[in-house]
Amino acid sequence: MKKRKLCMIFLLCLALMTLVVGCRSKKETNDQGNQKGTAIYYTNNDVTKLIMKKENVKLEGNQQQKVKILLKKLQQTPKSNKIRAVIPKRIMINGVSVNTNIVEIDFSTGYKRISENRDLICRAGIVYTLTQLKDINYVSFSISGEPMLDTDGTAIGALGRDSFVFGKLPMK
């Protein structure tokens, strides 16, 4: 009888803890959702970190138009002199298309000249900015119509938010 009572108390405490944890995480999610604006990712001047800023961006039209609006924003020089655009000024975007849940971006050949660190920050900033759009889960990159390759010469493929490891991608 005593064992059964202890077991019931233990199960009740466990259920209560689960309920409390579930409520807390929901509240944290709601708090983050209360920040108004669209998340635009920039980098610091040393190009070592991604920095997210919420901005009021007028996203109108179909998915393709929204993607183009966000890409233009990622190319613009920010007002603050402490951050930079993730897409360097000298990099041109040849084309953009949206196919189901994947955005395909084709860069000019100038993209091949950016440093490895700048490349990582650029791709991560683009992926994090575009995948906040409804039904966009991945971004695929190419250079002058050819698939983008990693340092080993392997095609990078479509990248999602989970493609970047936070230990390797500093964020602020």
Residue ranges and their predicted role:
Residues 2-13, 17, 21-172:
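Bimodal "functional hotspot" detector
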